[in-house]
Each structure stands twice: as structure tokens, then as C-alpha cells.
From Swiss-Prot:
A GO molecular function held by the record: rRNA binding
Name of protein: Small ribosomal subunit protein uS19
Domain of life: Bacteria
Keyword RNA-binding: yes
Family of the protein in this entry: Belongs to the universal ribosomal protein uS19 family.
Native source organism of the sequence: Yersinia pseudotuberculosis serotype I (strain IP32953)
GO BP annotations listed: ribosomal small subunit assembly; translation
Amino acid sequence: MPRSLKKGPFIDLHLLKKVEKAVESGDKKPIRTWSRRSTVFPNMIGLTIAVHNGRQHVPVFVSDEMVGHKLGEFAPTRTYRGHAADKKAKKR
């Protein structure tokens, strides 16, 4: 279920402060964050945000199509290695 419109979008304050500081200074260095629950705001466009996926920080370059989505959507937490192959079917 989406968030109520009367509440508005959510962003962690510490991340918002880092984004505003980077926009003011024009710094292009990636912003490291563990806040996967924060919503992408329009003032983040053009910044690189390193989102933690549980093991490492995944660099995410924010574009205008990402606005309104959560940061965690762009840093997958699970790796899919495929199902085990059936050895009987391979011999035929």
C-alpha cells in the first residue's frame, strides 16, 4: 500500500542534510547511506548515492525517472545464482 498523501513523502533528515550540502557545494562525490527507506526527491537528480544492500554500498546515479521511488529499489539485496541443473536431462 502506498503512503498516505496527507503525510507526504519520507526522507531521513541526515540524508536530506547531506543532499542539500552536496547540491550547494556542487560536490559530485557519492553520498553513502544506509537509508533504503528514503524517497528520491527532485533535488537529488544528478547526484550519485551509494545505497547499502546489506553487504556493500551500491552506487546509484539518480535520474528524473527515479523521483518518487525508494532508494532501496535500486540496490538489490539478493543474488540469484539459478536453480540446480538436472543431470539426467543433460545426458539425453
